[in-house]
Design a protein with these regions (language model features):
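Hydrophobic ligand-binding cavity/cleft-lining segments
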Residues: 1-41
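Intrinsic-disorder/low-complexity, polar/charged segments enriched in Ser/Thr/Lys/Arg/Asp/Glu/Gln
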Residues: 6-12, 19, 43, 55, ...
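Short beta-edge strand/loop motif at the mouth of beta-sheet-based domains
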Residues: 10-11, 30-67
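Hydrophobic/aromatic beta-strand elements that line small-molecule binding cavities or substrate pockets
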Residues: 13, 46-48, 70-76, 87, ...
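A short, structured loop/turn motif at beta-sheet edges
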Residues: 19-20, 49-51, 75-81, 102-111
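Hydrophobic pocket/interface hotspot
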Residues: 22, 32, 56, 74, ...
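Beta-strand/loop substructures that line and gate deep hydrophobic ligand-binding cavities in soluble
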Residues: 84-134
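Short, highly charged C-terminal tails/helix-capping segments
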Residues: 141-147
Length: 147
């Protein structure tokens, strides 16, 4: 019996900011609330207990007015290097997946790799890819050109 391979995605960005600054933007609620989300809509709230077993909870509003609430649990935390967390939508908790952020120092900044695994189907993978691309673009602008 073979197990079905669930869809995943991997995105990479080179950011003109230190791993410390990128990690802070991904983990500090007072920074997350300033930029988190896939489009120009606002982040309404951000909570993060950044330790293995700690939870995060983010509420953001899209420009079309839709409100989304991803939440999850931190599985692995290595400051300025790695962040692994479960990812679920408050409205669909049965669809838990796994997100990994890898931060690698490079000349001039940080290479950020985002891996989102265990997505339930191809449609979900495609929508998350679009969302993560928008979010990473916002992150690059938020932390870019800073030491």
């Amino acid at each position: 019996m073979t197990t079905k391979q669930l869809p995943s995605l991997t995105l990479v960005r080179r950011i003109k900011a230190s791993p410390a600054k990128v990690f802070a933007a991904l983990t500090k609620p007072e920074l997350m609330i300033q930029w988190w989300g896939p489009d120009a809509g606002p982040t309404l709230s951000a909570e993060a207990d950044v330790r293995p077993g700690g939870r995060f909870n983010i509420v953001f509003q899209l420009t079309n007015g839709d409100v989304h609430n991803p939440t999850g649990v931190y599985k692995d935390v290595i400051p300025e290097k790695k962040l692994v967390l479960t990812w679920e939508w408050r409205e669909m908790p049965e669809r838990e997946s796994l997100v990994t952020f890898l931060l690698e120092p490079i000349d001039g900044g940080t290479e950020l790799t985002l891996i989102h695994e265990q997505l339930p189907d191809e449609g979900t993978r495609q929508s998350h890819e679009a969302g993560w691309n928008g979010l990473l673009d916002k992150l690059v602008v938020f932390v870019g050109d800073a030491p």
